[in-house]
Every structure is written in structure tokens, then in C-alpha cells.
Amino acid sequence: VTSTNDAVYAATSLGAFRVSLEDNSITRINKANNLSDVGISCLQGIPERDMLLVGYDNGNLDIMIGNKFINLSDIKESALIAAKKINSIYVKDDFAFLCTEFGIVQLDLVRLEIKDTYLIGENGAYVNVFDLEIADGRILVATDR
């Protein structure tokens, strides 16, 4: 569950529900009417940008800005030989950090493009990253190791 300026969103494996904060109306959002995929793994609202990020089990990412949907399939289509699920999304300033089953992907929220990928295991090995937090200039990462 997450929120933007005008709505609260909840995810299911086949789509999401949007509850309007203005009139409490409920709208179903799915592959048939806006989303690019099924298998939602996480949602992250960014109220100050009127933006919603939708991460998927296969690494796909939808970005909703207002009522416009943009698909960013770079992770899904990458040649990485690893599971690509987006576990969670952390937002800091102009960037979103996608915590994935192989590491961390930094998304530029202004340019709407991948800025960098961090393989944080020993010698660049894949590490399943569940979540992260940035505090006091440090990145704290929750992994399976």
C-alpha cells in the first residue's frame, strides 16, 4: 500500500486498486487498462512528483505520472543471468533505488532512466536486496546474506 497526492494504491498479483482521496471511488488498474505487466511485486508513491512506481516480479517497471503511464523495461530485458524481481523501492531526492534480486538499480526520476546498477556481492556477485535506507550519508542494505 502506498499513496500519492490524490489517491491510495494497493497491489495484487494481477493489478492494483486506486482509492481516490477526493471521493473515495475505487478504480482497478491492470494490464487491460494501463499497466504493462502482471505480477506486481511492489508499489512506491512519490507525492511531491505526483508519481507512482510499480515494480514487477520479472524486473519490469511502470511509472505513472499524473494519469500517464510510462514503461521502463530495461531490467526485464537486460542480459543479466539472475532473477530480476524488484523487491522494494526507496526514494531519495531525484532518485529511486530499486532493490532487486541481483542488487540495486538507481533510477533518475527527472530523466526517467537508469543511472547505475550496483552489484554489491563479493567481486560483483549478485545479492538479493530486500530493502535499503539512506541515513547520515550511509546506505544500509537488507540482504539475504
Where do the language-model regions lie?
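Beta-strand-rich domains and repeat architectures in extracellular enzymes and scaffolds
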Residues: 1-15
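Short coil-to-beta transitions that initiate beta-strands within beta-rich domains
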Residues: 1-4, 29-48, 72-92, 116-136
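Conserved beta-propeller blade signature
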Residues: 7-10, 51-54, 95-98, 138-141
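Primarily extracytoplasmic ectodomains and periplasmic/lumenal surface modules that are beta-strand-rich
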Residues: 8-9, 17, 50, 60
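Beta-propeller domains
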Residues: 11-31
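Loop/turn residues immediately N-terminal
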Residues: 14-17, 57-61, 102-105, 144-145
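Short loop/turn segments that connect beta-strands within beta-propeller blades
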Residues: 20-24, 65-68, 108-112
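Surface-exposed, polar helix/loop patches in the mature regions of secreted/periplasmic/lumenal proteins
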Residues: 54-56, 60-75
